[in-house]
């Protein structure tokens, strides 16, 4: 928390033990990290598994995602979170944040609530021509003050 408040950057990426995770074992709720995330972490198992695939939707433009088309490949799951009042949710899946941003103190944070590697992020997502650009844009935004 203090690192972000003093000007640092933080991103939390989805997975089995991030956010709340499997059987709520992630335990990021009510932590110093949650205080500087743009989302609230649930206190229960937050995994939203969709083996059939579910389509992300761009709901708001954000400079970090500039040049990324609105038609994103499907993901197979994500960690369900609740956006904070001051969050900028750029991409949703089933009405939940997939990519969200926030500024806290002198720093910034972001969440990417699906996997960044194959499991919830299938090969079609990870091999998408804009996948690297998403990460570069998020990293640039997080580190530009």
Regions found by a protein language model. Give the residues of each.
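Extracellular ligand-binding/catalytic regions of CAZymes and related secreted enzymes
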Residues: 84, 88, 96, 104-108, ...
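Solvent-exposed, acidic/flexible segments
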Residues: 3, 26, 128-132
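Subset of Sec-pathway N-terminal targeting signals
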Residues: 64, 102-103
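Short alpha-beta junction capping motif
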Residues: 1-24, 103-112
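An acidic, glycine-rich "communication" segment
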Residues: 11-13, 17-96
